[in-house]
């Protein structure tokens, strides 16, 4: 997860004979963006320094080597952070605590309170989150196309709320509240989170 360790390993693997596909993942800049935000000096400095290191590595690799750089998601600075601990009227509707991600929140709602939950949630969060039933969520292929994993139904509850704004709903319980709020995060539906670069370097 350290770029200064990743690059030497890539170079070493490239020296081995034969064709190969090397996949490398680095925890940063994701970790720095979570901690300091998208407009932070810490994140921008890291990215600039990493660009220089990758450029140097690319020049030293054989001419038949192609380097592809991308990300698994973008990032969005958080401007408003909610906790469901402040909304007992929402908690009352739930079988168990919400889960998944702070910008893609899964709810397990009591069967006899589904209508009430929809009305209450949309009244409080409707301008910042898009609430869908599990069926709507899956019909819209929000998890992609192909065969559905057999555990999907166990993980996504019967309602999903997706952030369409700069807001998040913290995943907290009364036993573990007060966690530090991330300056920036992902998993919502904004352009900043969903669009990623694809950089191709070849000689």
Regions found by a protein language model. Give the residues of each.
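Feature captures the catalytic ectodomains and active-site-proximal regions of enzymes
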Residues: 1-203
């Amino acid at each position: 997860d350290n770029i200064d360790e990743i690059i030497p390993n890539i170079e070493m693997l490239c020296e081995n004979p034969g064709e190969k596909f090397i996949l490398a993942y680095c925890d940063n800049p994701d970790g720095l963006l979570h901690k300091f935000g998208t407009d932070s000096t810490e994140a921008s400095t890291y990215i600039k320094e990493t660009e220089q290191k990758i450029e140097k590595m690319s020049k030293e690799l054989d001419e038949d080597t192609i380097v592809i750089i991308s990300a698994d998601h973008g990032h969005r600075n958080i401007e408003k952070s909610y906790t469901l601990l402040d909304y007992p009227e929402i908690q009352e509707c739930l079988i168990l605590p919400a889960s998944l991600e702070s910008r893609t929140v899964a709810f397990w709602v009591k069967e006899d309170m589904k209508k009430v939950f929809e009305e209450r949630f949309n009244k409080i969060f409707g301008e910042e989150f898009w609430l869908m039933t599990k069926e709507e969520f899956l019909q819209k292929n929000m998890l992609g196309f192909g065969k559905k994993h057999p555990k999907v139904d166990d993980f996504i509850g019967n309602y999903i709320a997706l952030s369409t704004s700069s807001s998040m709903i913290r995943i907290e319980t009364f036993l573990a509240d007060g966690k530090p709020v991330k300056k920036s995060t992902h998993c919502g539906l904004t352009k900043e989170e969903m669009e990623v670069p694809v950089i191709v370097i070849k000689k």
